[in-house]
Structure formats: structure tokens, C-alpha cells
Amino acid sequence: TLSETTDYTTSNSRLNAGILYDMTTISGEDLPDNIDKINGSHNGEGYIAYTFYLINSGKDTLSYDSEMTIENVTNGVDEAIRVELFVNGEKTVYGKTKSDGSGKESDCDKEFASSTEVMKDRREKLGPGEKDKYTVVIWLEGNDPDCVDKIIGGTMKLGMNFKIVETT
């Protein structure tokens, strides 16, 4: 079950973060320190932020796969996008491989998993009633060398999917 609150008074199988039109560039260093402490959609000027919970509402312990997919990109905006993912408070910053192919950008912890995936992971042994907290933050990194005029007006759509792979 997915929910925007810890008590999951309202639960869903699908959640949607708010859209930010005309996003301007910022530096990841300018993001608020408490960005993963606010539930639901909490966009700021220059970034999209969304916190939600995945709750095991069943009676069995389960393992699940998570993946963030790149569903649509225009104007090459993905070249300068950063995705910061907090899972239970642990932060990882993802970015596309440098244009010259020489690895990850210096402000990133990991490169995008592929041209169509930001990340993928497996969570083992989530017990009945337990919850995992996710915060997704997206911004245009102004210090990225690929953050140039040609990406102005570009759009990007991301999706995050969860799939149970095992129950005990």
C-alpha cells in the first residue's frame, strides 16, 4: 500500500507528485535541509519534492523491487536533471553519465541505471505493518556543463514502480 502519511489513513496503489512548470536551475546545495521531513507533495522554487510511504499492509513478510523509470524526455533536459532519493533517511543523488562518457558527475553518488531507468533496487524482508519512507527530489543542476540553452522548455516524466517479488 502507498500513502502520503505515516498512519496511512488514505492509502492508494498509485500516487502522483505535483508538476512544476518553468523550472529554473538551482544547485543541489540550495535544497532545504529538511526536504525529506515533509509528507506529500512539497515543491519549492526550482525543485520537485514528494514524500510517501510504502506500507506492508498484508500478513506476510515480503521483498520487493523498486525502479524509477524515465518515461519521456524532450530537449535533452535529462542531461542536467538530478534525482535525489531518500529511502528511510538514506540519500542517494542520481544523474546521467557525463556527456563524454567518462562516468558520473561530481555532485552525484550514482549514474542513471540506463537510458530508461534512473535506479532500481530490491528491499528484503519488509514485515507486516512495517513501512519504508521515500522522498524523491528532482531539479535542474545549474552547475552541470550540459545545463545549456538548448534544454530550455524541455520536459521529463518519471515513474516509480514497486513489485512484490517474494513473500514468507
Q: What would you call each of these model-derived segments?
A:
Residues T1-L15, V73-T116:
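A surface/secretory-pathway sequence property marking extracellular, secreted
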Residues N16-Y21, T25, G101, E105-S114, ...:
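A signal for specific C-terminal beta-sheet/loop modules enriched in small/flexible residues
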Residues N16, I26, I38, H42, ...:
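Intrinsically disordered, low-complexity segments enriched in small/polar residues
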Residues P32-V73, S114-T168:
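C-terminal, structured domain-capping segment
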Residues T1-I26, G154-M156, F162-T168:
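Short, polar/proline-rich extracytoplasmic segments that appear immediately after membrane translocation
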